[in-house]
Amino acid sequence: MKVLIVGGGGREHAIAQSVAKSEKVDKIYCTPGNAGIAALAECAPIGAMEFDKIVAFAKEKEVDLVIVGMDDPLVGGLVDELEKAGIRAFGPKKNAAILEGSKAFSKDLMKKYNIPTAAYENFTDPDAAIKYLETEAKFSNCIKSRWTGSWERSFDLQYTGGSKRWCQRDYDG
């Protein structure tokens, strides 16, 4: 079996190590990969968000299974595109990946269905977030960015000044 892993971080390296142990796997590809993954797989310089190129590469190499490890291509719908092209893929489709891709969506869903979760608030305005921190927040704050990315943007801020600076920076982009 030929396997393509999409991503180039530690998660994808761990996936490549596990896949390499299978006697059923003859060849591993990775896009874009990294130096560590290159010891286990043939890496191709295709970005994780270049869906058309990933689909074409998978077809060209006659890949049997694509494993999508990174959040951004999952949230963007790569699994949907692969399946549309008749390529087997492991990972959630776009409509399910939003659970990982949007902390606000996930928290709102948990609240709606009474699923236990830590207290939270969602803000789209930095001034409203800062006002909440100054008047309502009673404990140290864990602030999560609204963006997915190659690394999780989450900060445990012990004092309001740091929380306010982080909010302003995140909203400024």
Residues covered by each model-derived region:
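ATP-binding N-terminal substructure of ATP-dependent carboxylate-amine bond-forming enzymes
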Residues: 1-94
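Short beta-strand-to-turn element immediately C-terminal to the catalytic PLP-Schiff-base lysine
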Residues: 7, 123, 155-159
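Acidic/polar helix N-cap motif
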Residues: 47-50, 102, 125-126, 159
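Residue-level detector of structured alpha->beta connecting loops
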Residues: 62, 86, 114, 137-138
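Conserved ATP-binding module of the ATP-grasp superfamily
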Residues: 65, 116-119, 138-142, 158-173
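Short, glycine-/small-residue-rich phosphate/pyrophosphate-handling segment
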Residues: 101-132
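ATP-grasp fold ATP-binding core
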Residues: 110, 134-157, 173
